[in-house]
């Protein structure tokens, strides 16, 4: 991450922790602290701060990303009028071709999938969209 005088260090630390957790089933405070070269107390404070918002879930001594993030993602996705407009066309195209159909939008130069439909011949995966 770029460090400038306008950045908030604690927010950057939290984002670094969340990025570390992404793609992992769960992490312990110690594992996260050691990997990111942070104090255990720092990791604990950050995770505790977002636990009530369901952004992380604590199960014993382990933490995982929570479904609270999903509600933010769905809210953002629903801001795109094309999401609702494309549903019927995506279903029809998936039925006609038997293939997986993706609806993607551009954001900051990146292609972001916001919906998908699986045809009868599509290989299924576990992503949400």
Where are these regions (language model features)?
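N-terminal helix-turn-helix
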Residues: 1-80
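Amphipathic alpha-helical effector-binding/dimerization core
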Residues: 74-129
């Amino acid at each position: 991450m770029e460090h400038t005088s306008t950045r908030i260090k604690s927010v950057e630390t939290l984002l670094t922790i969340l990025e570390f957790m992404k793609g992992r089933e769960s992490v312990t405070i110690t594992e996260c602290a050691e990997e990111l070269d942070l104090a255990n107390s720092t990791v604990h404070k950050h995770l505790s701060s977002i636990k009530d918002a369901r952004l992380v879930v604590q199960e014993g001594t382990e933490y995982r990303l929570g479904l609270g993030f999903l509600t933010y993602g769905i809210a953002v996705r629903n801001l795109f009028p094309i999401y609702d407009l494309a549903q019927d066309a995506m279903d029809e195209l998936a039925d006609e071709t038997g293939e997986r159909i993706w609806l993607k939008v551009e954001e900051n130069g990146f292609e972001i999938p916001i919906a998908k439909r699986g045809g009868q011949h599509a290989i299924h995966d576990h992503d949400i969209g």
